Amino acid sequence: MSEKHPGPLVVEGKLTDAERMKLESNYLRGTIAEDLNDGLTGGFKGDNFLLIRFHGMYQQDDRDIRAERAAQKLEPRHAMLLRCRLPGGVITTTQWKAIDKFAADNTIYGSIRLTNRQTFQFHGILKKNVKPVHQMLHSVGLDALATANDMNRNVLCTSNPYESQLHAEAYEWAKKISEHLLPRTRAYAEIWLDQKKVATTDEEPILGQTYLPRKFKTTVVIPPQNDIDLHANDMNFVAIAENGKLVGFNLLVGGGLSIEHGNKKTYARTASEFGYLPLEHTLAVAEAVVTTQRDWGNRTDRKNAKTKYTLERVGVETFKAEVERRAGIKFEPIRPYEFTGRGDRIGWVKGIDDKWHLTLFIENGRILDYPGRPLKTGLLEIAKIHKGEFRITANQNLIVASVPEDQKARIEKLARDHGLMNAVTPQRENSMACVSFPTCPLAMAEAERFLPSFIDKVEGVMNKHGVSDEHIVTRVTGCPNGCGRAMLAEVGLVGKAPGRYNLHLGGNRSGTRIPRMYRENITESEILDSLDELVGRWAKEREAGEGFGDFTVRAGIIRPVLDPARDFWE
C-alpha cells in the first residue's frame, strides 16, 4: 500500500462513547453481576449491553417475531449468542459432548453453529442460562473470554491436522499468541465462575485500561493453504519452514473486510507485508503490533478505528518501524511463500503416525438434526467412540482428527448413517454465509437461510454452461460488516435490504484480492442473470486453469482493486 498521505500518529478529538464505557467499567465488570439478577427484562441494560461482548456474548432477539411481540406490547424475545474461545479450532470429544448437551437442554434453537472464526457459537441462550453456560465451559477447560469486542479475538490456525510436525508447531503458536494477548482482568472469573475478589488492583499491561480501539483478529497460516483467509485479519503469521520444521514467520498486518454502505472512508483491505521474524521473537512482535494499534488507533470514530485505517493514516513504514522499536528487532526480508487455495479437502486424508483425518462438510456450519440428516446426533455418536479430537475449520466444516486405521470403518459408517458424508458438489463446498436473520441485529438481508437454495440455482447455471465440475468461491454476508468474508470471494453478495444485495466480482480462488462492486442493490434473479451471462463467457473464453475471478479481471469485466484506500469505491 502507498505512503502518499502520512497523517498524525494519534487522532485528536472527542472520544467515542465506547471509550467512556470501557474506562468506567472497572476493567469490564460494569454492573453485569447485578443485571443478571434483574428478572424484569430478558436482556442487559445500559453499558452492560455492550460490556457482555468482552465476555464473549452478544445480546440478540428473534427478528422473525419482533413486530408480533411489539404489537402484543411485549419486549423483544431477548437471548444471547455466546462464542467460545478455541484457538486453532481444536476441541476434545469430552468438550464436544458437553456443548452438545448444553445446546440441546439450554438454548432456544438447539443447534451448534460452527463459525468461520474456527470456533462454535450457541444461539438463543436465555438470561437465566448465561451464567450456567460459562460454568459449563469452564468445567471442561473452555471459556468465552475475548471472543468479541475490542480485544484480540479467537486466533485462527491452518486446519490440516497433524499432516506434519509443522502443523502441530503452528497450532502451539496459535495457542501461545492467544494466551499472551488475553485480558488480565479478573472480571470474567468473578462474575461467571464465582471466584473471590482479590485485593490486588487490576492491570492490563498489553491491552490497557480502555482495551483496543476496535476488534483485532490474528491468524497463523501454513502455505500453500490460505484456509483461514489471512487478508481478513489484522495480524498474520505466515509459517516458514526448512526441512519440514518451523523456523519463523512472515508477518502481514492490516487486513480487514468490514465496510459501511455509502461511507467512502471505509474499505476492505488486504494485509501489508512487514517482513520475516525468527520464532523466538513471535510473542514480542505480536505484543508490539497490538500495543502500537492500541496507542495509535482512532478512538474518535469506531468506523475508522481498525488497524487497516491506522496503517493508511500513519503509513506502513512508520507503523512497521514502531513495531520494530517496541519489539527490539529488525524484520528480515519477506521469505518466499505462495497460496494456491483455501478450501477444505472433504473426506479422508492420511496424516503422520498412520492416523487418518475425516473432513465433514457442514453446510453453513449449522449442526442440528434435520429430517433424514441427524447431523447433531451423528457427531455426538462419533464423539462417544472417537479417541482423538475434532477440529473446526475456518470454512465452517469439522474434521474428525487422528483416527486410527482400525476405527476408520466404524466412524465412516456413523458419519454416513447420519447424513454427514452425503455427496456435495465442488460449488457447494466452496460457498459460505454468515448467520444473518433471524438472530443478528445487524442483518439487512438473508444469508444462511438464503445460501442453500441460491447455490442450487448457481449450480443450475454451472450445469447449463458445462462447468459443473468447477467451482466459483461464493460468499453471502447479510450486512457490510462482512462476517461471511464476501470481500475475499470471486462472487461476493453483501446484504443491502431484504431480498437485495450488492454484487462484488473479481476476487480470486486463493483469497489474495479484494472484489469490486459490479452491481448495486439487486435481487436474486438479477444476480443470477448476471452470473448466467458471465459464467457462459468464462466457460467459452477462459484460459487453462483460469478461475472465474481471474477471468473477470483479465476479460475487463471488472477492474481489480489495487489500492483499496484510494480505489475501492471507484
From Swiss-Prot:
GO terms for biological process: cysteine biosynthetic process; hydrogen sulfide biosynthetic process; sulfate assimilation. The keyword Metal-binding applies. Gene3D superfamilies: Sulfite Reductase Hemoprotein, domain 1. Pathway: Sulfur metabolism; hydrogen sulfide biosynthesis; hydrogen sulfide from sulfite (NADPH route): step 1/1. Keywords: 4Fe-4S, Amino-acid biosynthesis, Cysteine biosynthesis, Heme, Iron, Iron-sulfur, Metal-binding, NADP, Oxidoreductase. [4Fe-4S] cluster binds at C434, C440, C479, C483. Its EC number is 1.8.1.2. Coiled coil: none annotated. GO terms for molecular function: 4 iron, 4 sulfur cluster binding; heme binding; metal ion binding; NADP binding; sulfite reductase (ferredoxin) activity; sulfite reductase (NADPH) activity. Its cofactor is siroheme; [4Fe-4S] cluster. Pfam families: NIR_SIR (PF01077), NIR_SIR_ferr (PF03460). SUPFAM superfamilies: Nitrite and sulphite reductase 4Fe-4S domain-like, Nitrite/Sulfite reductase N-terminal domain-like. It catalyses: hydrogen sulfide + 3 NADP(+) + 3 H2O = sulfite + 3 NADPH + 4 H(+). GO terms for cellular component: sulfite reductase complex (NADPH). Binds 1 siroheme per subunit. Alpha(8)-beta(8). The alpha component is a flavoprotein, the beta component is a hemoprotein. Belongs to the nitrite and sulfite reductase 4Fe-4S domain family. Component of the sulfite reductase complex that catalyzes the 6-electron reduction of sulfite to sulfide. This is one of several activities required for the biosynthesis of L-cysteine from sulfate. This is Sulfite reductase [NADPH] hemoprotein beta-component 1. It comes from Klebsiella pneumoniae (strain 342).
